């Protein structure tokens, strides 16, 4: 269970960081339309309990899904649901926690000095070069902070691993705590306390490591609030 928690936490946090940071860059730096509704849609998973998210995706990708049936790719009735797997747990954890990364990165983008980006564009740098040479290095502390939030949130998530992991025999520490509590066996409270302590130690160690990395990558470049870049998407 400890390995499964670490694996799902690390991998889902990486995926959540990629998704959340990409959405923050697209919404914060381009001229994409309807930014307000897009931000709401990105943040929507945070407003939905994890177990409800899992149930929704199970129905959306199941044999009775109207969309998949219309496309002719719905799983056969009686077959194993594709989300009942290690990959399904990691994917939904990433989707659930990507908004956390989005909020952190978007806030960091709004605090970056616009002058550096404007100077690079005036000097003839392409949008891709500005992104890789200026924006991403300045965002490194925010990316690490977003990753830490996603990892700790995934480590303590119960709803998604319970609904998707138990059928696949993929047990994480929160699920193991629930199973121990439901058993009402001798020494149940002791077992639960030990497991909870392990989770706390893992979370503290992970956050401490990322804090140290942040200190080495920290920048003090901030600027007054100004309109963000609006890189044309064509």
Feature map (PLM): residue ranges:
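Short coil/turn motifs that cap or connect alpha-helices
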Residues: 33, 125-126
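Short amphipathic alpha-helical coupling elements at transmembrane boundaries
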Residues: 39, 69, 73, 114-122, ...
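Peri-membrane helix termini and adjoining interfacial loops of integral membrane proteins
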Residues: 62-74, 166-176, 217-225
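Glycine/proline-centered hinge or cleavage motifs at structural transition points of membrane proteins
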Residues: 123-125, 137
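Transmembrane alpha-helical segments of polytopic membrane transport and secretion proteins
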Residues: 128, 210-234
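Glycine-rich helix-loop "coupling/hinge" segments at transmembrane-helix boundaries
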Residues: 159-186
């Amino acid at each position: 269970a400890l390995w499964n928690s670490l694996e799902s936490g690390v991998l889902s946090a990486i995926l959540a960081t990629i998704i959340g940071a990409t959405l923050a860059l697209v919404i914060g730096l381009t001229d994409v339309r309807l930014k307000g509704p897009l931000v709401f849609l990105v943040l929507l998973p945070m407003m939905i309990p994890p177990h409800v998210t899992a149930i929704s995706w199970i129905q959306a990708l199941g044999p009775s899904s109207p969309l998949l049936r219309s496309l002719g790719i719905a799983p056969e009735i009686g077959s194993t649901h594709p989300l009942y797997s290690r990959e399904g747990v990691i994917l939904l954890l990433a989707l659930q926690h990507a908004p956390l990364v989005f909020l952190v990165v978007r806030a960091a983008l709004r605090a970056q000095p616009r002058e550096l980006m404007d100077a690079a564009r005036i000097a003839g740098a392409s949008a891709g070069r500005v992104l890789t040479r200026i924006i991403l290095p300045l965002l490194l502390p925010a990316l690490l902070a977003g990753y830490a939030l996603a990892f700790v949130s995934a480590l303590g998530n119960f709803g998604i691993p319970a609904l998707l992991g138990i059928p696949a025999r993929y047990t994480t520490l929160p699920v193991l705590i629930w199973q121990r509590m439901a058993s009402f066996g001798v020494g149940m409270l002791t077992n639960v306390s030990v497991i909870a302590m392990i989770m706390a130690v893992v979370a503290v160690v992970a956050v401490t490591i990322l804090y140290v990395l942040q200190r080495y990558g920290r920048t003090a470049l901030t600027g007054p609030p100004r309109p963000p870049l609006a890189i044309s998407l064509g």
